Amino acid sequence: MDIDHCMPVFDMAYSDDNHLPYYIQRSTHHVVRDVDYTGFICYPLQVDLNDNVEVGADIYHMKIKTMRFNVDIYNNDVATKFPGWVRFIVFCTPPVSSWVNDGCSSLFSPFVGVNSFIDPKLLKRDGHGITVLHDGIYCLCHQEHFTRSFEFNFRGPGNYTLTSDVCWSPATNVDSIYVACVASWCGDSAFMLQSDSVSWVHKRFWQRPVLEFGQCLDDLPDHDNDCG
């Protein structure tokens, strides 16, 4: 079976002589939250990709194959009613640039010099670098909407094993995916995100969400680095 061609077939089990069964799962989610100058980082998924399953000496992870975002950001800065800017970023850990969108990505902290409130949240979660999937700054007039759709494709096989003495393999693993947003204005401005993702899910992850969709990074434990 060619797993790259069974993407449209959701909720199916697959196994062979080398891998435990996993499922191909499709998930759709929706979140609305406020966005202003303080910014936020949140998960666009209902699962934490760091929640490992250990089977003997092997570690299995959930794998994202394709993720689509529909974003709508609304400038409702009633205090000034001036135009303002918003920065929307999608990134993942660890650095996997050659395996995301055919290598079209860059490695840097997206928040340096932009929003100091966010930087500690990112540094708390990952000390080995990130892969920026999208980083855009957009100007919005008062009561104007920013709407955009994005699609990210992650290459590599499914839930292949990681032995205890091997760290993250960029060919097969995305540790976690994050969405961040920060704006120049104050007030009740809205951030809306819809995500549609297709994943390989190990059978022990099946219907076992550990995070609420859109949960903020501040609320999460620091358990990113499984390899010390």
From Swiss-Prot:
GO cellular component entries: host cell cytoplasm; host cell nucleus
Compartment(s): Host nucleus; Host cytoplasm
Family membership: Belongs to the benyvirus P25 protein family.
InterPro entries to which the protein is assigned, alphabetical: BNYVV_p25/p26
One Pfam family, short name: Benyvirus_P25
Domain of life: Viruses
UniProt name for this protein: Protein P26
Purpose of the protein: Probably influences symptom severity in a synergistic fashion with P25.
Organism: Beet necrotic yellow vein virus (isolate Japan/S)
Keywords annotated in UniProt: Host cytoplasm, Host nucleus
Main location group: host cell
